[in-house]
Amino acid sequence: MDFEKLERKICDFINSCVDNARAKGVVIGLSGGLDSALVATLCQRAFASAQGSASGLQSKENAGQSTLQTDKEQADKKASAQDESPKNAEQKGIFALIMPTQNSNKANLKDALMLCESLNLEYKTIEIQPILDAFLSECESVCKTRMGNLSARIRMSLLYDYSALKGYLVVGTSNK
């Protein structure tokens, strides 16, 4: 499988969805797990590639041989791409919401915060336990499954609220 080609296809899809919705960026629920970390990273790469400013070493074809671009070559390419882009083009944003409960894994929370820092993401941490407790105080015989489902619904509501606030699309992740 050609993973670079697959990544480009996914990044193109992300950009297409955001552009077609005329959104300014994406909102993602970041748990610290692999699924949300991968989606956040793909969104960042998608938006960077749309601006012609992908970071890191990039491969290129040179007479049939794969070589690595130097930092200077990448900087020159980035400057050239910026010169060609419209002056009013805005960088698409990524806003991460970290929404732990009292039962959330502390290591995952730490991982989510580290990912936000390493990807330079705008983020907000919202402790959803008080919201969960207020709702559960009105319910009868709450089991673990109902608590888990309610936590997911609260997170979804917050994601869509921030989506509307910022003019962003919600990017979903699975929990597999």
Where do the model's predicted regions map?
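ATP-dependent adenylation/nucleotidyltransferase module used to activate substrates
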Residues: 1-176
